[in-house]
A protein has these predicted regions:
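Generic secondary-structure microfeatures
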Residues: 34, 38-41, 72
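Arg/Lys-rich, positively charged N-terminal/basic patches that mediate binding to nucleic acids
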Residues: 1-36
């Protein structure tokens, strides 16, 4: 299912993304990931509810979390939200390296 749009959770995250160099491999991977999400909102891996970090539940009030694998062990985290109960919006919450990802999920 195609989402209505893919957005960043807040302006500071979007500024971080826009601040990345055009030749940065992470920015290129994020752009590819966004294009993939625009075609299929469910292209990531769904996190079981009991494994969603409490920090994210408290900070964003979310009830679902998706992980999109990026190259070199990086991960992009996003949530799917309903828009007028018909369309879906994919909201990018963060991207992180594998070490930070493991720390967040307590692996």
């Amino acid at each position: 299912m195609k989402p209505e749009k893919v957005i960043f959770v807040d302006e500071s995250l979007e500024k971080s993304f826009n601040g990345l160099s055009e030749i940065d491999p992470i920015k290129k991977a994020l752009i590819r990931a966004i294009k993939t999400l625009q075609e299929d909102a469910f292209s990531g891996r769904n996190v079981k509810k009991k494994l969603i970090p409490k920090l994210f539940i408290q900070k964003y009030g979310l009830n679902n979390l998706w992980i999109y694998n990026l190259p070199d062990g990086w991960r992009m985290l996003y949530v799917l939200t309903p828009s007028e109960e018909v369309q879906i919006i994919a909201v990018i919450l963060d991207w992180m390296n594998h070490k930070d990802y493991e720390r967040l999920f307590k692996f």
